[in-house]
C-alpha cells in the first residue's frame, strides 16, 4: 500500500478543519453533545484527541482565537473527565466557570491597563 502525499490544498483544508474543530472544544455544551453521543468512548476518536495536542505548540497555538480550547483538549486526555461530560450539569459548571474567568480577567486587565497608562503619564510629565 503506497503512502499518498497530501497536496498543498489538502494540507490547507486539513489545517482549517482541525483549527475549527479544536476551537469548538472550548464550548462545554459541544463537549456534552459529543459525550452524550458516545464519541469519547470511541478509541479512534480518543486517539484523535491525542493527535490534536500538537495545537499546543506555539507555531500552531498562535492561530487560536479561543485559547481555553487547549485546556479542554488537555482535560479530554483523561478518561474521568470524558465520562463526566455526559452529565449536562458538568458542562453547565464548566460554562459558568469560564464566564467567571472571563469577567475576572477583563476587570483585571482593565485595571492593569489603567495603571500602566497612569505610570506612562507620570513618566511623561516628570521627564519634561
Curated annotation (Swiss-Prot):
**Any signal peptide, and if so, which residues?**
none
Listed under GO biological process in this entry are:
regulation of transcription by RNA polymerase II
- Coiled-coil stretches are none
Q: Where are the transmembrane segments?
A: none
Citing just one GO molecular function, the answer is: transcription coregulator activity
Q: Does the keyword Ribonucleoprotein apply?
A: no
The principal location of this protein is: nucleus
- Stored Pfam families: Med31 (PF05669)
| Any one of the GO CC terms | core mediator complex
What's the superkingdom here?
Eukaryota
- Which UniProt keyword terms apply here? Activator, Nucleus, Transcription, Transcription regulation
| Localization in the cell | Nucleus
InterPro entries per the record?
A: Med31_sf (IPR038089), Mediator_Med31 (IPR008831)
- Can you tell me which family this protein belongs to? Belongs to the Mediator complex subunit 31 family.
Question: What the protein does?
Answer: Component of the Mediator complex, a coactivator involved in the regulated transcription of nearly all RNA polymerase II-dependent genes. Mediator functions as a bridge to convey information from gene-specific regulatory proteins to the basal RNA polymerase II transcription machinery. Mediator is recruited to promoters by direct interactions with regulatory proteins and serves as a scaffold for the assembly of a functional preinitiation complex with RNA polymerase II and the general transcription factors.
Subunit-level organization: Component of the Mediator complex.
Q: What is this protein called?
A: Mediator of RNA polymerase II transcription subunit 31-A
Q: Which organism is it from?
A: Xenopus laevis (African clawed frog)
Amino acid at each position: 500500500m503506497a503512502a499518498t502525499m497530501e497536496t498543498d490544498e489538502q494540507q490547507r483544508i486539513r489545517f482549517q478543519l482541525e483549527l475549527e474543530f479544536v476551537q469548538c472544544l472550548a464550548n462545554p455544551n459541544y463537549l456534552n453533545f459529543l459525550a452524550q453521543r458516545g464519541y469519547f468512548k470511541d478509541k479512534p476518536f480518543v486517539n484523535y484527541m491525542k493527535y490534536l495536542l500538537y495545537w499546543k505548540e506555539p507555531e500552531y497555538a498562535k492561530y487560536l482565537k479561543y485559547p481555553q480550547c487547549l485546556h479542554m483538549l488537555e482535560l479530554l486526555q483523561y478518561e474521568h473527565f470524558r465520562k463526566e461530560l455526559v452529565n449536562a450539569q458538568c458542562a453547565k459548571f464548566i460554562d459558568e466557570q469560564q464566564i467567571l474567568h472571563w469577567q475576572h480577567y477583563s476587570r483585571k486587565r482593565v485595571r492593569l491597563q489603567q495603571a500602566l497608562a497612569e505610570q506612562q503619564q507620570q513618566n511623561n510629565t516628570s521627564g519634561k
